């Protein structure tokens, strides 16, 4: 795709987003910056941006082939990718297959317990509030998403889990948990966005 890269629109912890000459396409530049502990610890990991770009793009393309719509358009180079412009739904969507970390502490479940069915959790994307966990009733009441959007997000999240579990199993990796973000295209369509 031939587009002109324009001004920076956004800079986050791990990436920068730039406008392009196509109003429906943006360019994402992946950085080497890393944070931990709700942003309290900051550092740099050499080539992290390259790894994140390449891995996320490969997974997005695989998910597209499995029928999950994503924002992926085209990888430009090691750090830069064109993606569909979305309005991010302010929810982190967490899928848990195995009890670990803060979940085990919060729920009193032993680490390593494999769940009979995956758990889907939402957190409200709000740095000032430290991304609190919410349920779908909060999401509806706060106008973060509609019921139809939440249904679509849940359907896609569980399908992503099935695809990623197979990919990871083939690589002898146990998929414990992961976070997803979704966005709205200009026509309101929900698609998988951000990075995996």
Tell me the role of every PLM-derived stretch:
Residues 95, 175-194:
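Conserved metal-phosphate-binding beta-hairpin within the catalytic cores
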Residues 74-79, 168-184:
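A short glycine-rich, hydrophobically flanked beta-strand micro-motif that places a catalytic Asp/Glu
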Residues 40-50, 133-156:
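Short histidine-centered catalytic/ligand-binding loop motif
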Residues 108-148, 196:
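Anionic ligand-binding catalytic core segments
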Residues 1-2, 76, 159-164:
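Short Pro/Gly-enriched beta-strand edge/turn motifs at strand-loop
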Residues 25, 88-90, 172-175, 187-190:
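Coil-to-beta-strand transition motifs
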């Amino acid at each position: 795709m031939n587009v002109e890269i324009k001004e920076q629109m956004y800079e986050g912890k791990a990436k920068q987003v730039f406008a392009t000459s196509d109003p429906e396409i943006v360019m994402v530049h992946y950085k080497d910056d890393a944070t931990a502990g709700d942003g309290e610890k900051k550092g740099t990991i050499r080539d992290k941006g390259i790894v994140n770009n390449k891995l996320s793009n490969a997974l997005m393309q695989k998910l597209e082939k499995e029928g999950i719509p994503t924002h992926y358009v085209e990888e430009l180079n090691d750090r830069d990718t064109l993606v569909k412009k979305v309005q991010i739904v302010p929810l982190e969507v967490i899928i848990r297959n195995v009890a670990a970390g803060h979940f085990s502490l919060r729920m009193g479940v032993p680490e390593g317990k494999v769940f009979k069915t995956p758990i889907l959790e939402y957190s409200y994307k709000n740095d000032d509030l430290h991304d609190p966990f919410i349920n779908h009733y909060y999401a509806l009441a706060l106008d973060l998403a509609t019921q139809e959007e939440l249904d679509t997000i849940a359907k896609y999240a569980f399908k992503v889990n099935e695809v990623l579990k197979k990919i990871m199993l083939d690589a002898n990796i146990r998929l414990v948990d992961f976070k997803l973000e979704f966005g709205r295209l200009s026509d309101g369509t929900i698609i998988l966005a951000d990075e995996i």
